[in-house]
């Protein structure tokens, strides 16, 4: 499964909250289900007990391009949600999808450590992320992104959307060769507006990568290097 032609899987030895964490990247839900079924057929599955899971799809933040597109359409006098408006948006999405295909279908980074956590945006009576104008959401997310870009050389981030699929709205996967980077990055991001005011975080899961060839060593109490 680690090198499946239909996608990739990665195994991590977890710290604190469990023993194993498996990450599956596939291009369809059917393929994800097949990965589940294949895992259940392994002899190892007799010794596994599911304690947590998360289902989501890779999602790209397109606030800047969306704001520009909406502004252009309004300036042309095109009515929001009209057939002309919808066609323009669909055409733009198709172009962006092709241009961003490597980001939509990434490889699982080869980094030694992973940190995963789910998150929501506040939507209460006092603070509601979804009631903000898109221009304001764009401003805050741009500020948020500036922090992440400062860590671009040391951590790989993959954001997934899970509204309608799981209990939280997004999943965040961080990959790095130094686990302390996770703490530094997340701590620094706590101070930007979108995190300090609108973010809600779930449990954090941290693990050490285990190649398939190292599973026997792990079961014998030796962490593969």
Language-model regions: role of each:
Residues 1-4, 40, 131-154, 190:
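Short amphipathic alpha-helical segments
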Residues 27-31, 59-146, 177, 216-225:
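Short S/T/G/P-rich N-terminal loop/turn motif that feeds into the first structured element of a domain
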Residues 29-54, 85-91, 151, 177-206, ...:
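An amphipathic, aromatic/His-enriched active-site/gating alpha helix that lines ligand/cofactor pockets
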Residues 14-28, 114-119, 165-189:
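Short, well-ordered beta-strand segments in beta-rich or mixed alpha/beta enzyme
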Residues 1-37:
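The feature marks the first
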Residues 9-13, 158-163:
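Short, solvent-exposed loop/turn elements at beta->coil junctions and helix N-caps
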Residues 152-153, 163-167, 197-198:
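A structural signal for short secondary-structure junctions
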Residues 12, 53-68, 206-216:
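Short, conserved secondary-structure transition motifs
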């Amino acid at each position: 499964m680690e090198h499946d032609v239909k996608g990739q899987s990665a195994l991590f030895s977890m710290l604190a909250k469990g023993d194993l964490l498996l990450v599956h990247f596939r291009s369809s839900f059917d393929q994800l289900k097949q990965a589940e079924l294949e895992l259940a057929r392994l002899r190892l599955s007799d010794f596994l007990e599911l304690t947590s899971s998360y289902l989501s799809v890779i999602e790209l933040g397109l606030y800047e391009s969306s704001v520009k597109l909406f502004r252009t359409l309004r300036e042309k006098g095109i009515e929001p949600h009209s057939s002309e408006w919808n066609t323009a948006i669909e055409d733009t999405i198709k172009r962006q999808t092709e241009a961003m295909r490597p980001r939509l279908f990434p490889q699982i980074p080869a980094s030694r450590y992973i940190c995963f956590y789910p998150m929501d945006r506040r939507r209460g009576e006092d603070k509601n992320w979804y009631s903000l104008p898109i221009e304001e959401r764009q401003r805050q997310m741009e500020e948020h992104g500036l922090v992440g870009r400062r860590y671009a050389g040391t951590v790989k981030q993959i954001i997934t959307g899970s509204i309608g699929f799981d209990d939280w709205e997004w999943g965040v996967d961080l990959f790095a060769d130094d686990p302390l980077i996770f703490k530094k990055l997340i701590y620094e991001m706590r101070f930007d507006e979108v995190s300090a005011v609108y973010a809600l975080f779930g449990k954090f899961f941290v693990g050490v990568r285990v190649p398939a060839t190292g599973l026997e060593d792990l079961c014998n109490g030796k962490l593969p290097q």
